[in-house]
Amino acid sequence: MTLGTPATHRLAIAALLFNAFTWGVSWWPFRQLQALGVHPLWQTTLVFAAAVAVLVAAWPRAVVEVVRTPSLWVLVLAAGATNACFNWGVTIGDVVRVVLLFYLMPLWSALLAWLLLGERAGLAAGMRIALALSGAAVVLWPAQGAPELALGLPEWLGLAGGFSFALNNVMLRREAGRGEHARALAMFLGGLLVAGALALWQGRNGVVPPPPDPAWGWVLGTAALAFWFIGSNLALQYGAARLDAHTTAVVMIS
């Protein structure tokens, strides 16, 4: 079920399309910043740290609502895992393979919408799931021989990111009655905390190098990315809160 008027429905779809565009092209600036020495996990951490600072400065009451609402903590984890896994995966692996596995999201959306929202997947949702699975099969099946069943770290990150994204969108729908600024802050906090924790953990293992000394190139690039992601994530939480989970899933893979 869609919330609001037909105009609201169209605006929600447009907002989701903007967010989908962001997911489709964001790998490029992340790779450019990685070439300047900033690991994607640190990029994600810094981008969302800036977003959190802006949102808290503008709407400080959102902090109280997030802290007092345990269900929004799930959104924190889901949004954080989505951004950390996707941004890391597309910078270390084949972009097409990672994105295709990420966009198995309709499969997870159908399952999570049934479990958390009571939304049953109809024939159209089933066809979307089949389309997502067939697309992944085409990419993973080589020109000759058996499919590549042994997935590497980038592919696992794509899968994990897609599942987290589905949970993120379902939780946005489930928590549609919460304040929009609180939902946005939960998503931004997730990007900051989850990516930051992973960066510190993998840094201790020698996998993720620390950020380089400040330089105009990567600092300005990170700032620009932060404002882009603020708009994109606000668009996602607006659209996903107003459309059913299955509609959100199909718009996001358009």
Q: What residue spans do the PLM features occupy?
A:
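Helix-helix packing/entry segments at the starts of transmembrane helices
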Residues: 100-104, 175-191, 229-254
